[in-house]
Amino acid sequence: MANKIETLSKIQEVGIVAVVRATSIEQAEKITDACIAGGVAAIELTYTVPHADKLIEAMKAKYNSGEIIIGAGTVMDAATARIAILAGAEYIVSPYFDPETVKCCNRYGIPSMPGIYTPTEAVAAMECGADVLKVFPGDIATPSFIKDIHGPIPNAVMMPSGGVDVDNVKDWIKAGAIACGAGSSLIKGAKTGDYDQITETGKLFVQRIKEARAEMAK
């Protein structure tokens, strides 16, 4: 298992985290395969998928080269976080800030990414030891939220999730996001069984993020 710094560095490098929601383990595996084929090397397997811990174990066994980062999402409490970590999850994402979940992650040396939406929540999560602040829901917050938070809290590390698509992902990166979580906009092809569409969308996300960073470096 990679250490916390390595995991966070890889997530920042790829810039996009695939938020995988599915009705079965089989469908989730197909979505994961399609995302990885598109260059999306950070996968968030959510606990809305039935038997998510078994899915995490299976994907960790399948992609064991160290190049793919498998995490758990929609983790609602510390007990679920521990189950996910023991199954092999390399990072934990939650829709809200729960101190006990963050403490559990720190106990195991696993990055935690709790959801936040206000400066108060951001500071509380940071003081508890959260590694990345999940800006959620991103479609309400908009990229300006990150700039506004970075004004008084410049050391906040943030990743939006919800509402991120290929048309606005560059705006999020340029606003200061370490990476972006993409769900329905990335995996919508799964509804019709068009997994090639997921792969192509993944490639486009990766390309747009590279473009944004290149433009920022000028």
Label the predicted regions.
Residues 95-101, 135-143, 175-198:
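Glycine-rich phosphate-binding active-site loops on the catalytic face of alpha/beta enzymes
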Residues 31, 77-87, 120-128, 145, ...:
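Catalytic cores of alpha/beta
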Residues 45-46, 85-87, 108, 118, ...:
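Glycine/Thr-rich beta-alpha phosphate-binding loop at enzyme active sites
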Residues 21-23, 70-78, 94-98, 114-119, ...:
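Glycine-rich beta-to-alpha transition loops that act as phosphate-gripper elements at the mouths
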